[in-house]
C-alpha cells in the first residue's frame, strides 16, 4: 500500500455522498507498499480503508478481488469487507480512478517471526483454500511460469547488473523449472502474496489477511510455496527448518497435503522464488514513484532461489 494519488477531505466527502454515512472524522495516508493508494479514514466513529487503484485499471479484475473478499468474509475468513454504496456497488470513483471502501481490521504485521506465528499462518492459509471451493469467479495467474521468460528477456541488463551472467543463469533455471513443473495438483483461488506485511496479528493470533490483489487460480501448493519463501527465511536469508515445519503443521492440520503436492513442493518453491525475484527486478528503478514507496530488494529472492536449487526432495527442508 502507498500514496500516489493525493485527495482532500472535500474529495472524500464527494465520494461518500454515494454512501449512507453522516460524518467524515479524519483521513490519513498510508505509505507502506507499492501497488495502490491507500488512506485510513474515520467515518461516523468507525475506521475504514479507502483504496484507490493505480495499476489495476480493469474493473472486472477489481470486481473479482472485491467479490472474493466478500465471499471469504461471509465464510468467516478474517479479511477486509468491501462496503457497498447506495447503488449496491463495491466500486466507486475518486479523482477519475476506481476506488473501494473496505472495513478496517485491528492488528499489526509482525517483524520477528516465530514458530507460533507460522503455525497460525498455515492454518489461516488452509482455511482460505478450503473456503474458495464454491467461489464461482475465476482469474488466471498473470504471473505464472508461462510469463517468466518474458520478464527475463525484458530485464536482461538489470539481471546482469545484479549479478554477472545472471540473465543466462536464470534462463537455464527456468528451463529446469519448466521440465519439473507439475501438470495436475489440487487448485483453486490462491492469495499469491501472503507475505508478513499482508497478515495482521492480534494477541499472537491472525486477525486478518489483507491485500488480495494478486489473487488468482493456481495450485494451492504454489500458494504454500510462496508462504515458505516469504516466512521461512530469517533476516540473514537463512532457511529455518523449525519455522518451515510449523507452517506445514498448521496447514496440514486442516488441509493435509497430497503425496504429489509434497513431492512437487521443491520445484514450486523454486518457481515462486523466481517469480518474486523477477517482479522485484522489474519494479527496481523502473517506477515514477511520487511519495515514499517501499521498493523491495530482489537480492534476497536470488539467494532463496539458489537455496531451492540445492533441494532434491521434501526431506531436505527438514520435514
PLM region spans:
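A glycine-centered beta->alpha junction motif in the catalytic cores
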Residues: 99-112, 153-156, 276-291
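All-alpha amphipathic helical-bundle segments outside canonical DNA-binding/catalytic cores
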Residues: 257-269
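Conserved NTP-binding catalytic cores of kinases and kinase-like/nucleotidyltransferase enzymes
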Residues: 1-84, 205, 316-319
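ATP/Mg2+ or Mg2+-diphosphate-binding catalytic cores
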Residues: 276-319
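A cross-family kinase active-site recognition segment
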Residues: 112-165, 187
Amino acid at each position: 500500500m502507498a500514496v500516489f494519488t493525493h485527495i482532500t477531505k472535500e474529495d472524500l466527502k464527494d465520494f461518500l455522498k454515494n454512501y449512507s454515512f453522516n460524518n467524515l472524522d479524519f483521513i490519513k495516508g498510508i505509505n507502506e507498499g507499492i501497488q495502490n493508494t491507500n488512506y485510513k479514514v474515520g467515518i461516523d466513529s468507525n475506521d475504514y480503508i479507502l483504496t484507490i487503484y493505480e495499476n489495476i485499471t480493469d474493473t472486472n479484475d477489481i470486481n473479482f478481488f472485491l467479490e472474493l473478499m466478500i465471499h471469504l468474509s461471509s465464510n468467516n475468513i478474517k479479511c477486509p469487507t468491501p462496503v457497498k454504496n447506495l447503488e449496491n456497488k463495491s466500486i466507486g470513483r475518486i479523482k477519475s480512478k476506481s476506488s473501494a471502501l473496505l472495513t478496517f481490521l485491528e492488528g499489526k504485521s509482525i517483524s520477528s517471526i516465530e514458530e507460533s506465528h507460522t503455525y497460525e499462518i498455515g492454518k489461516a492459509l488452509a482455511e482460505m483454500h478450503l473456503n474458495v471451493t464454491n467461489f464461482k469467479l475465476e482469474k488466471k495467474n498473470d504471473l505464472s511460469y508461462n510469463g517468466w521468460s518474458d520478464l527475463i528477456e525484458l530485464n536482461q541488463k538489470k539481471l546482469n547488473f545484479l549479478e554477472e551472467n545472471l540473465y543466462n543463469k536464470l534462463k537455464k533455471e527456468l528451463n529446469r523449472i519448466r521440465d519439473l513443473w507439475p501438470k495436475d495438483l489440487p487448485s483453486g483461488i490462491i492469495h499469491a502474496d501472503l507475505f508478513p506485511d499482508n497478515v495482521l496479528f492480534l494477541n499472537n493470533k491472525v486477525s486478518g489477511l489483507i491485500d488480495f490483489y494478486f489473487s488468482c487460480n493456481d495450485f494451492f501448493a504454489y500458494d504454500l510455496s510462496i508462504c515458505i519463501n516469504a516466512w521461512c527465511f530469517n533476516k540473514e536469508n537463512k532457511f529455518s527448518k523449525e519455522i518451515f515445519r510449523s507452517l506445514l503443521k498448521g496447514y496440514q492440520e486442516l488441509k493435509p497435503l497430497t503425496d504429489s503436492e509434497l513431492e512437487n513442493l521443491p520445484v514450486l518453491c523454486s518457481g515462486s522464488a523466481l517469480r518474486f525475484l523477477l517482479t522485484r527486478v522489474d519494479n527496481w528503478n523502473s517506477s515514477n514513484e511520487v511519495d515514499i514507496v517501499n521498493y523491495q530488494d530482489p537480492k534476497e529472492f536470488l539467494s532463496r532461489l539458489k537455496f531451492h536449487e540445492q533441494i532434491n526432495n521434501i526431506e531436505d527442508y527438514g520435514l
